[in-house]
């Protein structure tokens, strides 16, 4: 169960980071 939770957390972090990169890229940062 811990591995499954870790997988979901890591997936969420990667997804959030990707969205942040796109937003910052559009803002010219």
Swiss-Prot record:
GO terms for cellular component: cytochrome b6f complex; plasma membrane-derived thylakoid membrane. Keywords: Electron transport, Membrane, Photosynthesis, Thylakoid, Transmembrane, Transmembrane helix, Transport. One of its GO terms (molecular function) is electron transporter, transferring electrons within cytochrome b6/f complex of photosystem II activity. The chain crosses the membrane at residues 3-23. It is found in: Cellular thylakoid membrane. One of its GO terms (biological process) is cytochrome complex assembly. It is a single-pass membrane protein. It comes from the Bacteria. Pfam families: PetN (PF03742). The 4 large subunits of the cytochrome b6-f complex are cytochrome b6, subunit IV (17 kDa polypeptide, PetD), cytochrome f and the Rieske protein, while the 4 small subunits are PetG, PetL, PetM and PetN. The complex functions as a dimer. Belongs to the PetN family. Component of the cytochrome b6-f complex, which mediates electron transfer between photosystem II (PSII) and photosystem I (PSI), cyclic electron flow around PSI, and state transitions. This is Cytochrome b6-f complex subunit 8. The lineage of its organism: Bacteria, Bacillati, Cyanobacteriota, Cyanophyceae, Nostocales.
């Amino acid at each position: 169960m811990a591995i499954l939770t870790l997988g979901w957390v890591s997936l969420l972090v990667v997804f959030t980071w990707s969205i942040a990169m796109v937003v910052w890229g559009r803002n010219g940062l």
